[in-house]
Amino acid sequence: MQQNYRELWDETRYRKVLEIQHEDILSFIAGQLRPNNFAMQFFYGFNIALVVFFLLTISRDISVAPFSLFSAMLVFMAGIPLFLILLVPLHEMLHALAFFLLGARKVRIIPRWEKLMVYAVADKFVLNFREFLFLALTPFVLINLGLIILLFVIPGVWKYAVWSALFFHATGCIGDFALLGFLSRNNPLETVNYDDFSEQKTFFFEKITNVD
C-alpha cells in the first residue's frame, strides 16, 4: 500500500534530512559532484569509458574510413540538436513513465528554461530508495543502451551524431546520479522522499529506526 506523505511529518517516527526548492536544484547538484560514493563513481567511470571508446573509434576511422576528421566533427555537432529536441523530452517522459509504473498518477514534466533544465515530479507520492533507484536509472539505462546499439547499426560518418547524443545524454544524467549519491550516503534503506507541487519542493525523510 502506498505510504501517505503526511505520515512523514510525524516527528516521533521520521526526521527530515533534506528539503530542496526546485529552483535551487542546480545548486544542490553542484554540491554533490565529489566521487565519494558508488553512484558518482559509476557516473564518472561510465563517462570516462565513453571518452576512451570514442577516441579509439575516431582514431581508427580517420585512418581507414572514407571520411575526414572534419566531416566527423561536423556530424558530431549535428547531434547536439538531436539531443535537445529528442532526448531531453524522451528522458523526462521515461521518468514520468517510471513514476506511473510505480503507482503515481499526479505526474508533471516541468521545464525551467531560464535554468536550462527540465524535470519530472509526482505530487505527494512517497518513494523509498529502491523505487527512487528505478525512477532515476530508467532513462539512463534505456536511452544510453539504445544509443550504444545505434553506434553499431548506423553506418559511416553518421554514427558521430549518435556519439554526440550519447555524450550529452550520459553527462546530462548527472542530476539523477547526484541525488542517488546523496541517498547512498544517508542511510538509503530508511530514507523516503516526495515532491510537493504547491511548494515546489522535494522532501527527504529518514525513518527513526528505534521506533516501531
Name each region found by the language model.
Residues 208-212:
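Short, charged juxtamembrane terminal tails flanking transmembrane helices
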